[in-house]
Amino acid sequence: YINYFVLVPDAFDRMANEIRSICADRHGMLWLGTFDGLYRFNPTDNSFVRYETRSRKLPNDTYNNLVNALYIPENTPDLLYVGSSSGLVVLDIRHPEQPLGTLRAEDGGLTDNDIKSILSYDDTHLLLATADGLTLYDTRSCQASAYYSSLSDPTSLPNNSLRTLFRDRQNIVWIGTDSGLAKLDLKRKKIDCVRLTNDRKGAERKVIVNDLLGPPDHSLWLTTNEGVLRYDSTRRDAGYTRYMADKGVSHSIAKRLIRDSHGTLWLGTNDGIDYYDAARDRFVRAEHSN
């Protein structure tokens, strides 16, 4: 490992080192969403540049320093969507000091300003998971559609507090919420809640789903506050496999998943990083060596 601490030498160091999201652009730069704004890291010279309200490089009150989500669409690789706790900001990565646009709940474009995850559905539509519902935003017409939870509607979200989004190869959008998993078929405009139970007669588990990761196989991986779940998304009545300490997971609160270029699955937890050993069907702690 190489450690990078203290991004900037001022009073906000601790907040800046709490990284919420990372995104790489086509020029090799890393963009970091932190508790103290947006940073760009240049790996060629190990330099950081901060973009936040106090530095006036993003001179509008739409942009809040807490950045939860970063997203660069494949079809527009020079656009960076920045999801903060007070709305959405669109940047051109070639000129990030000049925001191209903003979107806030007050403008009628968001279900809530606190954005947790951003995802492209197609070339013109963005999905924005927020702390109070899901927004489908048309980037051409600037029109928005909202999806909420409703106790009287079994085809609605299980909870309005959303955490993560993932789109699979069949264009099904999987949604991680504070009350479990849902999937959205935008062609049918239908949401299905997914029962997370291994027993058809058993009580459904209302787990907090922090992150989602899909193929190469048919498994949908979920990180939760009760370990890691592997769910077979191809089987309608499928249960799940749970990975906790007995399966090598370092901490029951599992946060983030990523698959590297070699196909290895990496897991971030509240107590370190693990990787998945497929041959043994268990996670192994990645030890830090100085």
Where are these regions (language model features)?
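Carboxylate-rich, polar loop motifs that coordinate divalent cations or form catalytic acidic clusters
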Residues: 1-290
